Amino acid sequence: MRFDIVTLFPDCFNSVLNSGLLGKALAKQIAEVHLVNPRDFTTDKHRKVDDEPYGGGVGMLMKPEPIFTAVESLPVLPRREIILMSPQGQTINQSLLKELVTNYDQLVVICGHYEGVDERVLHLVTREVSLGDFILTGGEIPAMALINGVVRLIPGTVAKTESLTAESFEEGLLDYPQYTRPANFRGLKVPDVLLSGNHAAIAQWRYEQQIQKTRDRRPDLLEKLEQGKQGSRGAGGE
């Protein structure tokens, strides 16, 4: 998959792109990331990318021309999505990440800055995406999260496929508690069932822990899971 990141601050991506699973995926050419600075597409001597909003207001807006020209300079793959990182967008979740990795070969990710972008930029994008209901100084950090989440779902990035299918959110539940050696650390003991070797009992314990943790911390996920089950039963005519 190809990622084209339109950002005023390309240097801030360097450490992220060269470390961990993402760095390995790029080294193996499972994915490729290209950084594009809209400032390189300005036509004035000051290379200005922002201006005051019409009608007045606080702060500056990113101008449309450099963003449009930057995106139009990119190669176009058949299955391309142009994403604006915006607090007004669809919140990133596992379902969205799976949709993107399944349906697209190229993601163009535009990182806003200042007080946002000129509204006409929305005529260029095909989707707005958000990291959550809070404001950051720019779209770079949300873009990093999006790229990381998508790349790890590309086959070949994660060594064990079961690591993806068994992890939190894939089943609609939070993850169960996990432990490693030592079995007793400062009086904090690993639950006996995990040391029993009884795989059926371990599986049952883990499922119960998932239900309990999700009920305590994210009851909304349980509601969605139940609604999905009811919808499936309805579709089946039961």
UniProtKB/Swiss-Prot annotation:
Gene Ontology BP terms: tRNA N1-guanine methylation
InterPro entries given in the database record: Alpha/beta_knot_MTases, tRNA_m1G_MeTrfase_C_sf, tRNA_m1G_MeTrfase_TrmD, tRNA_m1G_MTases_N, tRNA_MeTrfase_TRMD/TRM10
Location of this chain's protein in the cell: Cytoplasm
Keyword Methyltransferase annotated: yes
Record key words, sorted: Cytoplasm, Methyltransferase, S-adenosyl-L-methionine, Transferase, tRNA processing
Annotated positions binding S-adenosyl-L-methionine: 112, 131-136
GO cellular component: cytosol
Catalytic activity as recorded in UniProt: guanosine(37) in tRNA + S-adenosyl-L-methionine = N(1)-methylguanosine(37) in tRNA + S-adenosyl-L-homocysteine + H(+)
Molecular function as annotated in GO: tRNA (guanine(37)-N1)-methyltransferase activity
EC number: 2.1.1.228
CDD domains, per the entry: TrmD-like
Alphabetical list of SUPFAM superfamilies matching this protein: alpha/beta knot
Role played: Specifically methylates guanosine-37 in various tRNAs.
Family of the protein in this entry: Belongs to the RNA methyltransferase TrmD family.
Subunit composition and interactions: Homodimer.
Name this protein carries in UniProt: tRNA (guanine-N(1)-)-methyltransferase
